[in-house]
A protein has these predicted regions:
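S-adenosylmethionine/decaboxylated-SAM
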Residues: 2-23, 40, 45-153
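Conserved alpha-helix/loop element of class I SAM-dependent methyltransferases that forms part
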Residues: 29-42
Length: 153
């Protein structure tokens, strides 16, 4: 569980973000926008493998509601929705340490993400799958062989 922002101070938070963010934050928003536009004509769900704090998941939900409608594409999020998981993969250990140092160990909870999506009126046609993605993704794919993916993040 993370500390959610004060939604009554959205304007202030927006200004703080743009005044303090690194250029890579803006490039990420633009990249997600371009990827979403490319997926518009492709049937299938938007799938995010690793929701973490929920920013890109919420961004895709808002894009969907801006460009289409809530039922145009299901958005599926896979995450532990708890502590950022450990890794045994040597190449990922340094990256994990950097992420934990910069962003903290704790992910957004499913309840918090659902609350945020409801406040933004983007909570329809969303599915959150909690657990170890190395297990939950194969299980989900086996139970949903009809799944088509238009955007994988």
């Amino acid at each position: 569980m993370i500390k959610l922002p004060d939604f009554t101070k959205a304007y202030e938070h927006e200004n703080d973000f743009y005044l303090s963010c690194d250029i890579t934050r803006i490039s990420k928003i633009l990249a997600h926008y371009e990827l979403y536009k490319m997926s518009l004509e492709i049937p299938g769900a938007i799938v995010e493998c690793g929701v973490f704090k929920g920013a890109s998941f919420v961004r895709f939900a808002m894009f969907r509601n801006l460009f289409e409608n809530p039922y145009a594409k299901k958005i599926i999020g896979f995450d532990s929705f708890g502590d950022f998981p450990e890794t045994e993969f040597e190449a990922d250990k340094k990256l994990r340490a950097h992420i934990v140092k910069e962003a903290g160990l704790q992910s957004i909870s499913t309840e918090q993400l659902e609350e945020v999506l409801k406040k933004k009126e983007c909570s329809q046609n969303i599915e959150l799958i909690a657990g170890d993605i190395t297990k939950t993704i194969p299980e989900y794919a086996e139970k949903n062989p009809q799944l088509k993916i238009s955007l994988l993040n």
